Amino acid sequence: MTATDQNTPPAPPPPGLCNSAARAVMASKVYGAGDTEVRALDCISVDFERSRFTAIMGPSGSGKSTLMHCVAGLDTLSSGQVFIGDTDLSRLSEKQLTLLRRDQIGFVFQAFNLVPTLTAAENITLPMDLAGTKVDQAWFDTVIDTVNLRDRLSHRPSELSGGQQQRVAVARALASQPQIIFADEPTGNLDSRSSSEVLDFMRRAVDEFGQTIVMVTHDPTAAGHADRIVFLADGHIVDEMAEPSADKVLDRMKRFGE
């Protein structure tokens, strides 16, 4: 069992033996207090396995984006623990957390977040340039060919379609070879064809490179590209699905009233 919201936390594995790229242990996130208190996450424990594509789904307000943001170190828990590999994020200073996000985590958001004055190639290498890290040219070439951007590297974002811009964002996340990539509604601003292209590239990153991806989505078709889906409702994990398909996901979501 890899996900639970029961009151008995799983024992942490010995350092170095954890097969989780990331995990939450008894994670709770509370906003407000008293009559205005909202429990966005309520004692959730979940593992995200290495080299796997996991989707997080649930109705609006279920806590899925909150869970992703807390596990990615973009927000803090009210109680519980979050680990990236064997590293407990609660034990890190702000500077250490910033460095961990830079060096070990890739992000893909609904908004492309590209720098408009930079070319596609410059946007892809920007995180490494800011970190003072040398670009691995062989890996860069592999990523570019995987996301099919070779003939668009000199183009600026305004010269690219939405799908091409999101492929640049995916390439940027892959280029630094992070331990895990978090994607928050990555196809939310794309048409169906562009969405399919981006999701296919993400799937290839898992299958061919062993990349770990955790994706928040409302879309059953997008979730169907994952190896596993974790379903949230009211801050709890309420179900899981292995080897999903779009039709199976849609049927399951209907049961949740969405």
PLM-predicted stretches and their roles:
Residues 236-258:
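Conserved beta-strand-loop-alpha-helix hinge in the C-terminal portion
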Residues 19-226, 232-234:
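ABC family nucleotide-binding domain
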Residues 2-17:
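Pre-NBD coupling/linker segments of ABC/ABC-like ATPases
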